[in-house]
Amino acid sequence: MDKCKHVGRLRLAQDHSILNPQKWHCVDCNTTESVWACLSCSHVACGRYIEEHALRHFQDSKHPLALEVNELYVFCYLCDDYVLNDNTTGDLKLLRSTLSAIKSQNYDCTTRSGRTLRSMVSADDSFISHEGAQAFLQNEDRAFTALWHRRHALLGKVFRSWFALTPKGKQRLEEERLREEAEHKREEARKRRQQLKHKLKEEMESTPPRKSSRLQQQIQPSPKIESSSVQKMNQKNAPSTKQNPPAPTSDKARLKKIGNSPIKRKPTVTPGVTGLRNLGNTCYMNSILQILSHLHVFRECFLQLDLNQTQELLAADGSGKTRLSSKYPPGAELPRVTQKHTKGQRSLARRPSFSLGLSGGASNSRNMELIQPKEPSSKHISLCHELHTLFQVMWSGKWALVSPFAMLHSVWRLIPAFHGYAQQDAQEFLCELLDKVQQELETTGTRYPALIPTSQRKLIRQVLNVVNNIFHGQLLSQVTCLVCDHKSNTIEPFWDLSLEFPERYHFSGKATASQRPCLLTEMLAKFTETEALEGKIYACDQCNKAQKQLMVCRLPQVLRLHLKRFRWSGRNHREKIGVHVRFDQMLNMEPYCCRESTAALRADCFIYDLSSVVMHHGKGFGSGHYTAFCYNPEGGFWVHCNDSKLHSCAVEEVCKAQAYILFYTQRVTQENGHLSERLPLHDSPQSPPP
């Protein structure tokens, strides 16, 4: 619509919530796909093709104008059309330019004369300058987790009261009463044995020693006080061991004791079930971080390794030359991460103590800073250090929500392509993140090795081995001459398999693409099918006709399958193939492997179990929302990770998801035939049952 009369009445507030990237998601369903911000109030919700929360807001409030956060379109509900005009003050134009600057984190502007005016605050510094906003969100994380604990405590109290009235609860109370009586009898028997032991010891000490013992005491006089006198003094001061039997415990107290038992009680928050706040179109990062944290071996590596201490050691001065403290000479082992330095040095205790924190009490600010600091303490930003810190919080079983400010800051600094609040691709982010982590480990391990303790160098090599090999596999590219049957083999490494959809899903224009579900096994078969080489691509002496085939010759421990859902449509447009891909919990890779290379493997080595799924919600490449399904081995259930909102789900719901990236974990490794023991650190990764 060229002219919308409702725009002229618009009065936009300068502190509108749309200027805060953390608000760029639906307040009801948490999606970042097709998000519309009301221009009359601070409400942000999804469009009518998602859950219609923005439309419902208009029906309740009668606020007509809304702006799409990512595409910057303005829509009028009263006119039922898009708005092209602006008000007299040009608020819409100013709002669009402001949002574009926030999204790209580029605050430069050009005057009419062509001069570029740069903001006094750089893009990186602008992230750090909003300490008030970060502190506010951290307090919200604290309050959210405290509320989580409070709700579960009340639910537990109500459940225990109800359980005490049921036949099963009464039986449980009777069993606990009998167990207490048996424990009391064992305690009494133990005390009687203790008294008898003390009595025999006193009698032995009161008897005169033998001659040989007296001579030995004269030769080597003992400066210690006689133990018998000390024991008699202690017995006089100590309370009598003969105590009355404890009063019988009431059923209510006994049931409460059962619920509060440290042996049986599980953490209120299951380790790993911690939400990540969306800081502004960061769902791509949150979904990948959830996936990596649920890969057991990957997580255990970074829980042990903290490169922050090593990098501070190497970067003690700007020239790269550093001297170790006299307390830690070269070759000595530095203190562990959980220890603290001497006075005047920064604390390295990364694991916060939650003694009074979020179990209904207030945690001090120092513990909050140890979770995700607002700014890395060292000039050398470390992705490994941020992974170490974030995984500690997510798997502590204490926090229900955390804001990954420091992780986002490190990504902005080290991976400039993801700088800003624009929507990004999760697959590209995963590849870039792993590449940067690998480079950081290689650089840290080889730079000034004499300054790094031997134990730390060994740990860095082990973690680097995990990062390099956990997704690493090998492909056999085999070209066969159709005339002389000569075969040319080439080994190529891979870290994921990008699978294309069959041709029936690639029609465009007048032809209609098929909407029948596609099978994952069909896409794998297409990846390994024989392909004819046309033209003078292949030269075999006098022959030229050949065919090529890709086969897997070395299986990775974690198999990443990237479904190529986005295709080019026209010159500059990429559209999405939205067909459902059927995949199972178990995947047999034997049909797609080279028989000659894998002939010595056991049959179980080809079996993979589904461990994680990344989903893309939306219709286009440049827009949409990412969520993830992760199998949590601590709780033995699947979790749907939608930024800050997490909930358990059934595996049937997982298999119905519109998958974008699939993660399968090898059930038995090919080196030794044991369950997932390829990598050297800690326990073997726990895979979901088939």
UniProtKB/Swiss-Prot annotation:
UniProt keyword GTP-binding present: no
Biological role stated in the UniProt entry: Deubiquitinase that plays a key role in the spindle checkpoint by preventing premature anaphase onset. Acts by specifically mediating deubiquitination of cdc20, a negative regulator of the anaphase promoting complex/cyclosome (APC/C).
One Pfam family from the record: UCH
Catalysed reactions listed for this entry: Thiol-dependent hydrolysis of ester, thioester, amide, peptide and isopeptide bonds formed by the C-terminal Gly of ubiquitin (a 76-residue protein attached to proteins as an intracellular targeting signal)
Major localization class: nucleus
GO cellular component, one term: nucleus
Annotated ranges, domain USP: 274-667
MF GO annotations: cysteine-type deubiquitinase activity; zinc ion binding
Classification via PANTHER family: UBIQUITIN CARBOXYL-TERMINAL HYDROLASE, UBIQUITIN CARBOXYL-TERMINAL HYDROLASE 44
Record-linked PROSITE patterns: USP_1, USP_2, USP_3, ZF_UBP
Residues annotated to bind Zn(2+) 2: C26, C29, C46, H53
SMART domains listed in its UniProt record: ZnF_UBP
Stored Gene3D superfamilies: Cysteine proteinases, Zinc/RING finger domain, C3HC4 (zinc finger)
Zinc finger (UBP-type): 2-99
Keywords recorded for this protein, A-Z: Cell cycle, Cell division, Hydrolase, Metal-binding, Mitosis, Nucleus, Protease, Thiol protease, Ubl conjugation pathway, Zinc, Zinc-finger
Organism of provenance: Xenopus laevis
EC number: 3.4.19.12
Polar residues composition-biased segments: 214-244
Signal peptide range: none
Keyword check for Ligase: no
Active site residues of this protein: C283, H625
Binding-site positions, Zn(2+) 1: C4, H6, C76, C79
Basic and acidic residues composition-biased segments: 173-190
Name of the protein in question: Ubiquitin carboxyl-terminal hydrolase 44-B
